[in-house]
A protein has these predicted regions:
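Fold-independent oxyanion-binding glycine-rich loops
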Residues: 115, 166-167, 195-196, 231-232, ...
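Conserved beta-loop-beta/alpha segment of the NTase-like Rossmann-fold superfamily
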Residues: 187-286
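Conserved structured core elements
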Residues: 104, 111, 123, 135-142, ...
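Structural beta-sheet core signal
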Residues: 110-112, 163, 192, 248, ...
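Short acidic, glycine/serine/threonine-rich loops at helix termini
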Residues: 122-125, 172-178, 202-207, 258-262, ...
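Short, Lys/Arg-enriched N-terminal segments with co-localized hydrophobic residues
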Residues: 1-18
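N-terminal glycine-rich phosphate-binding loop and ensuing alpha1 helix
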Residues: 21-190, 199, 210-226, 235, ...
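Catalytic core of tubulin tyrosine ligase-like
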Residues: 242-247, 255-259, 264-424
Length: 425
């Protein structure tokens, strides 16, 4: 067996071993990150402990994103078949029956990805706390819970709901739910946890300091939620239960159907390992990740990775061959997810603006991207599945994302769709 430096670090953490100061200095020197202790002697005892604790918690796997150059691999990209609306509508009562029974039998739990802030909406709170109402209060979190409650009433059974926050909005999110009595949901079924963080680095790979005693950390992307649940100590209870499926969804689509018994029932009936809700692309160049197959396995290809030929290719019936956009609403089998805990996830490097302190300890707020962030993506989790039911939904009824304050995918467009679907705002 060949063990790496990372293996020994993670084994030590698993055994509860805490490094002393000299061991930390040696570790940082080996990773060429000794500058993290630059201001150590200027700190008080509490600040020293915060810094050392953050250093102990660094996931050093981000270094592999630098050491492994991106290399072209032989990939066969093919279109993927979907269960389309016409077929779903014809069999929906059967699918609904199968799905509701699975929910009654305690086979389904839910995961809400709610780490985002409402910054792009001009709102300095968790995005889920944003009020989309015009004449009354109607919050994003409220709408999502109401969608789940529709299923709870139909199944006569509550569904465990896990809510992943960031370290920034964790307490604000809990306080908001408590202040609104969980919008009628049984609080004993709701579990909050914090998304894991990765350090941000400058373009030379040096980890940035947010302050003299804080590492610059950022959320690890939308693909790392299962390891974050593991770190939060939530998985033992899940593994010991009857739960078989987890429905993962994002906070910003206010029309989506969550715990959808038709989606669940169709996925179970198909015999496929996983499921993904999709919408038909509005036009070939729409900026949305598209479901396809890569080397025979389910995959999401980003719009900017598609060739002109792929963008415009059509099937015999005239539809786009690569025409189903993923909307971040998935069904994953817990048994397969358990196996992924022992498997690595690719890290994607993105350029972002990250505030930091310079060598003199002065705070700097950059006006241009100055740093790398390292993220795992849900599309890589999809690719770990043997197969996937591509489940089409009506975008006018289930796709109203809120990403901007105005324009495309905005509060304005979401309000229009809510009104169109009978909501009083």
């Amino acid at each position: 067996l060949c063990y790496t430096k990372l293996d020994f670090i993670y084994y030590g953490r698993k055994c509860g071993y805490t490094m002393n100061f000299e061991e930390r200095k040696k570790l940082l020197a080996e990773w060429k990150q000794s500058h993290l202790l630059r201001f150590y002697e200027q700190l008080n005892d509490e600040e020293k402990q915060i810094l050392l604790s953050q250093i102990d918690g660094i996931d050093w796997s981000f270094e592999q994103a630098f050491s492994h150059e991106s290399k072209s691999k032989d990939s066969l990209i093919e279109e993927i078949d979907a269960l389309q609306l016409e077929k779903i509508l014809a069999d929906q009562e059967h699918y609904r029956s199968v799905g509701l029974q699975a929910i009654r039998d305690g086979k389904l739990c839910l995961l809400l990805l709610a780490g985002g802030q409402g910054t792009r909406l001009g709102f300095d709170k968790p995005k889920g706390c944003f009020n989309v109402g015009l004449t009354k209060e109607l919050y994003i979190f409220q709408l999502l819970i109401e969608h789940i409650m529709d299923v709870v009433r139909a199944a006569d059974a509550y569904i465990p709901l896990y809510i992943m926050t960031s370290n920034i909005n964790y307490q604000d999110t809990i306080t908001f739910f408590e202040a609104h009595d969980y919008f009628g949901y049984d609080a004993s079924y709701v579990h909050f946890f914090i998304q894991e963080m990765n350090p941000a680095t400058d373009f030379g790979g040096k980890i940035l300091l947010k302050s003299k005693y804080e590492v610059a950390l950022s959320p690890n992307g939308n693909g790392g939620w299962f390891s974050s649940m593991h770190k939060a100590g939530l998985l033992d209870a899940i593994f010991d239960s009857n739960l078989e499926w987890i429905n993962v969804f994002a906070v910003d689509n206010v029309l989506q159907r969550i715990a959808d018994p038709v989606f669940l029932g169709a996925t179970i009936a198909s015999g496929k390992m996983s499921g993904a809700k999709v919408v038909k692309k509005a036009f070939p160049e729409e900026k949305v990740g598209v479901m396809c197959k890569e080397n025979g396995k389910p995959h999401i290809i980003e719009y900017y990775e598609m060739t002109d030929e792929m963008l415009t290719k059509r099937t015999a019936d005239g539809n786009l061959a690569y025409g189903f956009g993923a909307i971040l609403n998935y069904l994953f089998p817990i048994s397969r997810l358990k196996e992924t805990l022992d498997e690595s996830m690719p890290l994607h490097v993105v350029k972002k603006k990250v505030p930091y302190v310079d060598e003199s300890g002065n705070p700097v707020t950059p006006s241009e991207p100055n740093a790398f962030k390292f993220e795992t993506l849900a599309l890589d989790l999809i690719h770990k599945m043997d197969d996937c039911l591509i489940f089409e939904v009506d975008r006018e009824k289930e796709f109203a994302p809120i990403k901007n304050s105005t324009g495309v995918d905005s509060v304005e467009t979401a309000r229009e769709l809510l009104i169109k679907n009978g909501y009083t705002l």
